[in-house]
Design a protein with these regions (language model features):
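Conserved, mostly hydrophobic/aromatic
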Residues: 1, 9, 32, 102, ...
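Short, aromatic/basic amphipathic alpha-helical patches
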Residues: 1, 92-94, 117, 143-149
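Catalytic pocket-lining loop regions of alpha/beta-barrel enzymes
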Residues: 7-8, 21-128
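The substrate-binding groove and active-site-proximal loops of carbohydrate-active enzymes
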Residues: 12-19
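Conserved beta-strand edge residues that scaffold enzyme active sites
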Residues: 15, 46-47, 159
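Short gly/pro/ser/thr-enriched loop/turn and capping motifs at secondary-structure boundaries
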Residues: 17, 108-110, 135-136
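Mid-to-C-terminal alpha-helical segments outside catalytic/metal-binding sites
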Residues: 123-126, 139-170
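Short glycine/proline-rich, acidic loop/turn segments that cap or connect secondary-structure elements
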Residues: 130-139
């Protein structure tokens, strides 16, 4: 996959019914880390309000993700489609190694201002833009960034600079 230009690996632990912190999950994290890949982990794949009652897949628990982030400081994680980070160790700058970025696709910049709160507690350099495309229209995500009460330099970090650096694009 490296020869084909891949820069990351998307993991779906809850959908594929494995735990990231069990020996096989950690072996997968270690193998991807050895290849220099970013590990992309969606906290939520599908909104429970829209899916069939026959599908019972919980959201990725932040406690399990935080444990793996702490256990594998050389790995690089991209946590996407999540919310509520501000209340746990993933939302505090000195709680875990700086080996993860959080995508802002499910957060808001006005009502609870989770994006603004994370800028203050974690730093703009740990957040990346996310839109949920192709399943969501990007307009709302772009608007959230536009109305965010933050310096323009922080908005640029979130919009593209952090992701470009994380993926080693330039």
């Amino acid at each position: 996959c490296r020869d084909a230009g891949f820069r990351g690996l998307r993991l779906y632990p809850k959908w594929h019914r494995y735990a990231l912190d069990d020996p096989n999950g950690l072996a997968l994290v270690d193998a991807a880390t050895e290849l220099g890949m970013v590990l992309s982990i969606p906290m939520r794949v599908e909104d429970v309000r829209n899916r069939s009652w026959l599908i019972d897949v919980p959201e990725g628990p932040t406690s399990e993700i935080a444990a793996v982030v702490a256990a594998r400081p050389k790995a690089r994680f991209h946590l996407l489609n999540g919310a509520g980070f501000i209340n746990g160790p993933l939302g505090r700058k000195d709680a875990l190694p700086p080996n993860y970025l959080i995508d802002v696709s499910r957060m808001d910049s006005v009502l609870t201002n989770e994006i603004g709160l994370l800028i203050k507690s974690l730093g703009a350099d740990r957040l990346v833009f996310g839109s949920g495309m192709p399943f969501n229209y990007p307009d709302l995500a772009l608007l959230k960034l536009e109305v965010l009460d933050a310096p323009e330099a922080d908005k640029q970090k979130i919009a593209w600079e952090n992701a470009a650096g994380w993926l080693k694009l330039g």
